[in-house]
């Protein structure tokens, strides 16, 4: 099997992200083994940045 375009079609069988055990969001990367949203699997501390606070505030206003 070549490593170009034909093999990229095989990537759609398993999901890239599944539901995270810690935050519950669908952001846990199966291959890398950590959550993109909260950082579970990569560190014990919760993943948070100052640049994301504005978005979280806006999200809670609804």
Curated annotation (Swiss-Prot):
Annotated cofactor note: Binds 1 zinc ion per subunit.
SUPFAM superfamilies from the UniProt entry: Zn-binding ribosomal proteins
GO molecular function: rRNA binding; structural constituent of ribosome; zinc ion binding
Any single GO BP term: translation
Name of one Pfam family that matches: Ribosomal_L37e
Binding site for Zn(2+): 20, 23, 35, 38
Keyword match rRNA-binding: yes
UniProt keyword Ribosomal protein, yes or no: yes
Reported cofactor(s): Zn(2+)
Keywords attached to this entry: Metal-binding, Ribonucleoprotein, Ribosomal protein, RNA-binding, rRNA-binding, Zinc, Zinc-finger
InterPro entries, alphabetized: Ribosomal_eL37, Ribosomal_eL37/eL43, Ribosomal_eL37_CS, Ribosomal_zn-bd
Zinc finger regions, C4-type: 20-38
One Gene Ontology cellular component: cytosolic large ribosomal subunit
Protein family: Belongs to the eukaryotic ribosomal protein eL37 family.
Known function: Binds to the 23S rRNA.
Name of the protein in its database record: Large ribosomal subunit protein eL37
Organism: Pyrococcus abyssi (strain GE5 / Orsay)
